[in-house]
A protein has these predicted regions:
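Hydrophobic/aromatic residues within transmembrane alpha-helices
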Residues: 20, 57, 69, 129-131, ...
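Histidine-centered beta-alpha loop that forms part of the nucleotide-sugar donor binding/catalytic region
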Residues: 23, 68, 119
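Phosphate-coordinating loops and pocket residues in cytosolic domains that bind phosphorylated ligands
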Residues: 30-33, 66, 75, 150, ...
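Crotonase-fold acyl-CoA enzyme core
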Residues: 105-205
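Glycine- (often His-adjacent) and acidic-residue-rich active-site loop
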Residues: 59-106, 122, 152
Length: 205
């Protein structure tokens, strides 16, 4: 299965390890509809490629993913006005899912182990995107945040199912209710990430 042309990601395969890099460094890798579609296509590709034994997901530059790209202002979530509107309404099973939910459930269904290498800021969908991954490692400079309450919206991308199963209900509710941004050390102590690494040692780990 050929991988389509990628505009928001970079894809590399070396020694059986596929590395998918969120690649909008000038926008802190902010998530877009196109990025979501490309991530789904990339995971379709890794599942179909027998040369891939595992997948790493990371970000370019100083962020993993700083959340959704809100540069469209009030039109950001006006899906009906977009040519990709049909994609946003795609069912996953019997349920209509938001764009982030389609991506996280695709990652969850991956046939290959998925490792998140969280290299920097991970807030909003940058936080929820990593939850279905099998393992998460983080840079000591990474920061995390479920900031949805501060925006007056509910956590998306099926995170209300994934998060309590990783860190427990009490921690999940605290993070969601407060919307605060926290350091990598807390992510380690609460069980969100497996280990912390110096920035230049994260991918080799």
């Amino acid at each position: 299965m050929a991988l389509p042309e990628l505009q928001t990601l970079r894809y590399e395969l070396h020694d059986g390890i596929a590395t998918i890099t969120l690649h909008r460094p000038d926008k802190l890798n902010a998530f877009t509809t196109r990025m979501g579609g490309e991530l789904i296509a990339a995971f379709d590709h890794t599942d179909a490629d027998d040369a891939v034994r595992a997948v790493i997901v990371t970000g370019a530059g100083r962020a993993f993913c700083a959340g959704a790209d809100l540069s469209g202002g009030g039109q950001t979530f006006d899906y009906a006005a977009r040519p990709q509107a049909a994609q946003q309404e795609t069912r996953v099973g019997e349920v209509y899912r938001d764009g982030g939910g389609r991506v996280t459930l695709r990652i969850y269904r991956s046939l290959k182990p998925v490792i998140g290498a969280i290299n920097g800021a991970a807030v909003g969908i940058g936080m929820t995107l990593q939850l279905p991954m099998d393992m998460r490692l983080a840079s000591t400079e990474a920061r995390f945040g479920f900031v949805f309450a501060r925006r007056g919206i509910t956590p998306e991308a099926a995170s209300s199912w994934f998060l309590p199963r990783l860190v427990g209900m009490q921690t999940a509710l605290e993070w969601c209710f407060t919307g605060r941004v926290f350091a990598a050390q807390e992510a380690l102590e609460r069980g969100l990430v497996r280990s912390l690494h110096a920035p230049d040692e994260l991918l080799p780990a």
